[in-house]
Amino acid sequence: AALVGMGSSIFHPESSRVARMASGGRHGLAQSIFQVGGNMGSAAGPLLAARLILPHGQRSIAWVSLLALLAMVILTGVGRWYRHQHQQPKKDTLQTDTHLPRGYVIRTLLVLVALMFSKFIYMASISSYLIFYLMHRFGIDTQAAQYHLFYFLFSVALGTLLGGPIGDRIGRRQVIWVSILGITPFTLALPYVGLDASVALTMITGFMLASAFPAMVVYGQELIPGKVGTISGLFFGIAFGLGGIGAAVIGQLADLWGIEAVYKLCSFLPLIGLLAFFLPELHKQKYLPH
C-alpha cells in the first residue's frame, strides 16, 4: 500500500504537467481528460465488486491486473513523447506572470484549500459510506448498494470530463463557484428523501462537485505561472490527503452518532463555497503591481 501511495504521488503531479504540455492551449479540457481516467477507474470499482468479486471471490481481482499492465505499456509511449518534448529547443514565450502581490496569491491559495476541504470531505462522506447509508436507511442488499455507488461515481467522472472545457469557455472562477455552492440545496435535502431521490441527488452532487477540480487545478496553475508541477502536486496531495483523513473522521463520527446524523452534518459543508467570492478574476488582475 505504501508503494502504491508513493507511485501515485509521483504520477499525478508530473502527469498533470504532461497534460498541460499536450493541451494545445485548452488547459481545462486537457486536465479533465487526464483526471477522468482515474474517476472512471474509481467508478468501475463498485461495478467490478458487484459483478466479479462478490460472485467469484477475491482471487478474481487478479484478472484486473491486466489493465495495469496495459497502462504501463501506454505510459512507456507517453514517457518517450515527454522526453522528446524536452529535447526540443525552447521557443520564446510571452510573460504570463499574473503580477498579483505575494500576499494576495497566498490568500487566494488558502481560499482554494478551504474550497477543496469542503469538496473532498463531502465527497469522502459519499464515496466511502454511501453503501452503508443506503443499507442502513433503506434496507437494500450489498449488491444493490454497490450499483448505486457506481451511479454516483459515474456522475463524478462525467462532471470531471465536462468541468475543464466549461471552465475554458465561461471562466474557472464561475465553475468553482457554481459547482460547490450550487449543490447546497441538494445536499441539505439528501438526508430527508427516499431511496430513488437519494440516488438522484447523489448523482447531481457528484457531477457538480467533480466539475470543480479540473477548474481548480488550472486556476492554480494560472495563478502561479511556471510552477505547474508544484501546484499540481499541492492540489493532488491535498485532495488525496483530505479524502483519506475525511473518510477516517467520518467513520469515527458515524460510530458515535450514526451514519444518518453524519450525513446531516456534512450537508452543510458546501456552504463553504461562499468563499469563492474572494477568488479574483485572473484576467482582470493581470496588470496589478507587485
Where are these regions (language model features)?
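Small-residue (Gly/Pro/Ala) motifs that create kinks and tight helix-helix packing interfaces
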Residues: 41-53, 131, 246-254
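Extracytoplasmic gate region of multi-pass secondary transporters
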Residues: 107-153, 157
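Cytoplasmic helix-loop-helix junction between adjacent transmembrane helices
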Residues: 1-37
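Structural signature of the two symmetry-related core transmembrane helices
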Residues: 174-188
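A late C-terminal transmembrane helix in Major Facilitator Superfamily
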Residues: 225-257
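Flexible cytoplasmic inter-helical loops of multi-pass small-molecule transporters
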Residues: 77-101, 286-290
